[in-house]
From Swiss-Prot:
This is Peptide chain release factor 3. Residues 10-278 form the tr-type G domain. Increases the formation of ribosomal termination complexes and stimulates activities of RF-1 and RF-2. It binds guanine nucleotides and has strong preference for UGA stop codons. It may interact directly with the ribosome. The stimulation of RF-1 and RF-2 is significantly reduced by GTP and GDP, but not by GMP. PROSITE patterns: G_TR_1 (PS00301), G_TR_2 (PS51722). The gene is prfC. Its main location: cytoplasm. One of its GO terms (molecular function) is GTPase activity. GO terms for cellular component: cytosol.
Length: 528
């Protein structure tokens, strides 16, 4: 490994932002881009009708609703680091896409609403992070509004997310009484200054806990601050980088993203603490980012990022080696050598051609239907990276076409949208139905809107008698033949040709499990 390679890997930080809906994640994403110099002025998700929409919410449906539906990938620089930021869907109906994004990052930033504490979606996402021991930094947001006491929020995080908190900044007051944050490491008070028209404002800084200026600025709140800091010093968790990197302890920052407050301190610390690109497990071995041969894995496919070009982009995480424009690599699933000629990097929907990229970088490659989620590309060695699954959907709909003459467009649209992984497509063994399965019901609405907008297909849904899906596996051909014969009307193939049992109710599933003990009923399926 040469020095350039090591230097490029070591300065990269690839992370995802996760939160419950409305905790302020997309706003914080904007502010990270603002402080990183990638944008000059932040738009706010709140004023959706204004000309400036949040940079990362670029799809029309996201701008209409003010929620993040797809995953945006953005690159910027800060303090000598190359940062790859993945803004994940915050809405509970998009957790499967969020999960796959978390397989492409080395760390995560968790955003918590100070008024609400830990919420349901946060629990699900933290389960995913725990599975991979992902290091987490926490930003407790909306201190400019009344909320829970910071000790209460941290206790909620520790008890419900099973991770210890180590505050690195500490808030003084909240809501109308919010005065700023104390930086525990530097011994400085950062006075709160509301943002001015989305631009960065620099507030007053007071040095030292015993500085008379502190009492002058805070009044009685200075006494409370000293008491709380003494309590933290005695009973709090000291920061331990090793425990952070193991996913056991989270450094905590407080602020107000909409006011650009507390963001710079968090970002400065984050890039110093967060891990550089990590080794990636493959079926045959673990691949180090410092290896010289190129390898990468596709974790997401987005159709029609530019409606004018009818394009699909495959998002690839580089795992090892160096990418150079036009390089020839092996696409292992189809066994072909391909040239990566037109790779791009992203700033939401803005794309820039990329001449070179390194481990940890996310590049987009044009996909004309040959690339799928989970595909591995490498220079020589046949590799298959693991850990990118499908989850069994919980909601199902039958797709009905209003205009029978558009059957081909419907099929093409459903297949392409299913390739993105946001919805799963099933074709029953009996009949010609299209059954869609999703983790959350809002995804069905998204699919119908995108079919109309991007494929000019008017479709609607009918309910169907399906409550759950399980992928089937057995090493006993006789068991499989018997099962297929007995449950034929309840079986379907998914988009990748894997057999699934679509159970009409939980009791029917229980009965099938009891009747066929040699059959595995799987709730996840590794993307092949």
């Amino acid at each position: 490994m040469n020095r350039e390679h090591q230097r490029e890997v070591d300065k990269r930080r690839t992370f995802g932002i996760i939160s419950h809906p409305d905790a302020g994640k997309t706003t914080l994403t904007e502010k990270l881009l603002l402080f990183g110099g990638a944008i000059q002025m932040a738009g706010t998700v709140k004023s959706r009708k204004a000309a400036r929409h949040a940079t990362s919410d670029w799809m029309a449906m996201e701008q209409e609703r003010g929620i993040s539906v797809t995953t945006s990938v953005m690159k910027f620089h800060h303090n000598g680091y190359e940062i790859n930021l993945l803004d994940t869907p915050g809405h509970q109906d998009f957790s499967e896409d969020t999960y796959r994004v978390l397989t492409a990052v080395d760390s995560a930033l968790l955003v918590i609403d100070s008024a609400k504490g830990v919420e349901a979606q946060t629990l699900k996402l933290m389960d995913v992070c725990r599975m991979r021991s992902t290091p987490i930094v926490t930003f407790i947001n909306k201190l400019d509004r009344d909320g829970l006491h910071p000790l209460e929020v941290m206790d909620d995080i520790e008890s419900r997310l099973n991770i210890q908190c180590s505050p690195l900044t500490w808030p003084i007051g909240m809501g109308a009484d919010f005065k700023g944050t104390w930086d525990i490491r530097t011994g400085r008070l950062h006075m709160f200054t509301p943002a001015n028209d989305g631009r960065i404002a620099s507030g007053r800084i007071i040095e030292g806990l015993d500085n008379p200026e502190l009492d002058e600025a805070l009044g009685e709140q200075a006494v409370t601050l000293r008491d709380e800091l003494a309590l933290l010093a005695e009973a709090g968790n000291p920061f331990d980088k090793e425990r952070y990197l193991k996913g056991e302890l989270t450094p905590v920052f407080f602020g107000s993203a909409i006011n650009n407050f507390g963001v710079r301190e968090m970002l400065d610390t984050f890039v110093d603490l967060a891990p550089a690109p990590q080794p990636r497990p493959a079926t045959t071995r673990t691949v180090s980012p410092y290896e010289e041969d190129f390898s990468g894995v596709v974790f997401k496919i987005q159709a029609n990022m530019d409606k004018n070009h009818r394009d699909r982009i495959a998002f690839m995480r580089i795992c090892s080696g160096k990418f150079t424009r036009g390089m020839k690599v092996r696409h292992h699933r189809i066994g072909k050598e391909v040239a990566l000629a037109n790779a791009t990097i992203f700033m939401a929907q803005d794309r820039t051609g990329v001449e070179e990229a390194w481990p940890g970088d996310i590049i987009g490659i044009h996909n004309h239907g040959t690339i799928k989620i989970g595909d591995t590309f490498s220079l020589r060695e046949p590799l298959k990276f693991v850990g990118i699954p499908n989850f069994a959907p919980e909601h199902f709909r039958r797709v009905v076409l209003r205009d029978p003459m558009k059957a081909k467009q419907l099929q093409k649209g459903l297949e392409q949208l299913a390739e993105e992984g946001a919805v799963q497509l099933f074709r029953p063994l009996l009949g010609n139905d299209y059954i869609l399965g999703a983790v959350g019901v809002l995804q069905f609405e998204v699919i119908v809107a995108r079919l109309k907008d991007e494929y000019n297909v008017n479709a609607l849904y009918e309910g169907c008698n399906i409550t759950t899906a399980r992928w089937l596996h057995t090493d006993d051909p006789k068991t499989m033949a018997e099962f297929r014969d007995y449950y034929r009307s309840e079986l379907a193939m998914d988009a990748e040709g894997c057999l699934a049992y679509l159970a009409p109710n939980p009791w029917r599933l229980e009965s099938a499990v009891e009747r066929y003990p040699k059959m595995e009923f799987r709730t996840t399926r590794e993307i092949s």
